[in-house]
Curated annotation (Swiss-Prot):
Binding residue positions for Zn(2+): 301, 303, 491, 506
Disulfide bonds: none
Name the UniProt record assigns to this protein: Probable inorganic carbon transporter subunit DabA
GO molecular function: zinc ion binding
Positions of the UniProt region annotated as Disordered: 598-617, 794-817
Zinc as UniProt keyword: yes
CC cofactor: Zn(2+)
Organism: Salinibacter ruber (strain DSM 13855 / M31)
Amino acid sequence: MPIDRSVVRARIENAAEYVGPLWPLRTFNAANPLLGFEDQPFDRAVQKAGQLFGGRGYPGPTVFRQAWENGEIDADVLTRHLAEHGITERPEVLLDRMDADAAGRDAAPADQPLDRVLTKWLAAFLDQGQAAWPMPNREDGFYAAWRTVAPYDGDIPGVGRPSDLPGTVVEAFEAVLESYPEARWEPIFVHHLTALPGWTGFIKWRSRRADTAWQAAHPISLTEYLAVRLTLADRMGAAIAPDRTDELPANGTDQPVLPRIWLRAWEESYRTRLLDDLRQTQQTTPSGSDAGRPDAQLVFCIDTRSEVIRRHIEQQGPYETHGYAGFFGVPMQHQPYGTEERVKSCPPIVDPKHRIMERPAEPHRAQAERYDWWARLQKAGAALLKTLKKNVAAVFGFVEGSGGFFGAAMAARTLAPSGLSRLDEALDDWLPGPASFCEPTVDRAPPADADAEDGLPVGLADEAKVLYAEAAFRLMGWTDTFAPVVVFTGHGSQTPNNPYKASLDCGACAGNPGGPNARVLAAICNEDAVQEALRERGIAIPDDTVFLAGQHNTTTDEIALFVDEDDPPVAPDALDRLRRDLHAAQADAATERVRTLNTSVDEGRPAAAVRETERRAADWAETRPEWGLAGNAAFIVGPRALTRGLDLDGRCFLHSYDWATDDDGTALENIMTGPLVVGEWINTQYYFSTVDNAAYGSGSKVTQNVVGKLGVVQGNGGDLMSGLPLQSLKADDEHVHHRPLRLMALIQAPTDRVEAILDRHAAVAHLFDHEWMHLTVMDPEQDDAFVRYKPGGGWHARPAPDASTATKAPASAGVPS
């Protein structure tokens, strides 16, 4: 029976909305696993997702019990929420009831032969250079390539030669769908796309990027995926259509009410503590400042980990810190020195507009040549090693002859990781990396240098330089009072042998370190022409202000400054003082961080704390080098004066903003439609990875295996894992470190300004209306009164508190907090 291809395509596109995109490990991006459900209320969405993916939508009773015993859920708040639903039992009784209800729900899913066979071929086709023997005919597309090799798969019955299978994708759909009315096609597609949401999410991501090398060479689409899966299901006797009992109800929700109540009470308790602390800080901080010009100002990413180091830097002396999206407003593709690889270095919701290359500075040509010689030697050695390991004739002799060497190296990496790290540092001192002799190509190159594949121009036009510099200062509300030194500080992690390293790097840079972006913006702002153009636009940068770039190592809290040591742009004594204070801040921040990492480091030993973080950064067996963004709970948009001196426990995204310098609301609009949305993606990924790690996370790192250099699976096969590993979320088997709360956005701005932005951007408004996030406004035109947004529109006024309570939740003895 011929089928209408346009109808099939439309039904597949509709069904694919239920599957969120999954980025490859190299550019891991945090994203809401229920991204396709955000147009629905949260409670309804998690119910639908639970039926499709089998995952929970709310924290389990063990998590609620930990929060209750730690005092994180206010008793009065919980009692009020329960009373609104006519529930009068004691919280302990309700926790026991939820325990009983949860018993037996975590049974492992039954093994599906269809999934096992299909994932084997998906891994072979989508391999990105890991396999020594790649799947043949991949250039013909997934269905055609699979059809040629399927006869050799003994798990597929009745296929002796390719001609036993439909010849084309269209014929495959016709063969399977002829028994079903058109009205059932979309539920069938939903059923099969959501059976393996990790693999289909990756295919969805890759198929929408036809310009990527792997997709161009080996094309695949969800249509081809469904053609293979439906053909396999037909051959293996698996269900084609979902059971009618699995179909989703049209309206309403029958989700258990208790978890919803407890979650809302927990979220309100956190919100109340945070707002009380902010109010108390506002009352004790004098308006205005007579501190004068600071010694230095440092701009950090809004990342929650920046809150800790910013606080400790400010305690060292006359320093100011600001928060800005970690790609520093420059939508670029970065090409590191000595490689043809190009990496996206801007948020996942932004397309690169420029290609920035690293080229040796003229005074450092000799240093670059020495580095090139060493790099060629390393490359040749790596190629030889790969050949010996993969060559059939040489591999056995190679293993016999080199076993002692590799065994000793493995023992050293395991038993003395810090020692090897110091050797690496000594090598870096002898042969510094490209950052020491290269400079970014910020000037626009001739059109002939534009990339032939994507057309991105190399460098930036003069107008773009001014635009990015002005946007950075405008969004932060920073138009005057520039220090002699301003440091744009990107961030990146340091961790070996970690498939999820990109998840610890800068999310605003697409899972890459933010140092390159910081160097670009610093170079732009140092140009005389840019500063002159900024003066004409009302941003006066003093003649003695120098812009530097740096990178915050979030694993060790070390901040490296990118400075030409032979010709530093800052006076040596000022540079030494800044570095000394940054080192002191590192020690204080490390002391704070190690308290949450279950270490044996004693309190009050900063040097030992730094050594412990450095060990974790070097240890290839360390499953938890750092916590990443675990604990994130709030996104604060406002001047640093709102939070300066307040210990936010590394749980808040901090974006600098001054409503008084943003008359038309453009800066706030950019923040709410950009960084705030990315913050919601990060928060929901941590939330769902915590509430149901089996469905939305990636399990234990100990049992993960990398497949095809694109993702991880648990054990030796199965679905691609889409979320975060347990070690990024839990302190141990019983206690969570990440508190699964939906993100609270707090914005200091006039209420009508925020409301106007929501009216113009329905997608952002839906996140609040459907309770994927909560919104509170601190209205400066109403004496900084807190007003809370009501889903669907309108505002709740919040009465002023009688006294402040601590933002940090109290912890009971013996329970990690």
